[in-house]
From Swiss-Prot:
Function: Prevents the cell division inhibition by proteins MinC and MinD at internal division sites while permitting inhibition at polar sites. This ensures cell division at the proper site by restricting the formation of a division septum at the midpoint of the long axis of the cell.
Full protein name: Cell division topological specificity factor
A Pfam cross-reference name: MinE
Gene3D superfamilies documented for this protein: Cell division topological specificity factor MinE
Keywords, sorted A to Z: Cell cycle, Cell division
Species: Caldanaerobacter subterraneus subsp. tengcongensis (strain DSM 15242 / JCM 11007 / NBRC 100824 / MB4)
Length: 91
């Protein structure tokens, strides 16, 4: 699912190619499918968009794998989600 189209924005082929390349690079780093990362991004956006308006063009979600001091590896999810404004949430 294209994040730009999901929220009514338009994307061009450059944006789509860039997003696909980023997903492939992450896939290579952590041995998971690009679709898995896309599903995580969709879920994060669905939850966060209940509380804030997000700038989808600046959205970056990636999973990295880093070596710890004991030579084991740990994966980490990094999300950079630019917030346009907070929504008024009544509970």
């Amino acid at each position: 699912m294209d994040l730009f189209k999901a929220f009514g924005g338009k994307s061009n082929s450059k944006d789509i190619a860039k997003e696909r390349l980023q997903l492939l690079l992450v896939h290579d780093r952590i041995d998971t499918s690009p679709r898995f990362l896309e599903m995580i991004k969709e879920d994060i956006l669905n939850v966060i968009s209940n509380y804030v308006d997000i700038d989808e063009k600046g959205l970056r979600v990636e999973i990295t794998k880093e070596r710890k001091s004991d030579d084991t590896f740990i994966s980490a999810l990094h999300a950079n989600i630019p917030i346009k404004k907070m929504k008024q949430v009544i509970r």
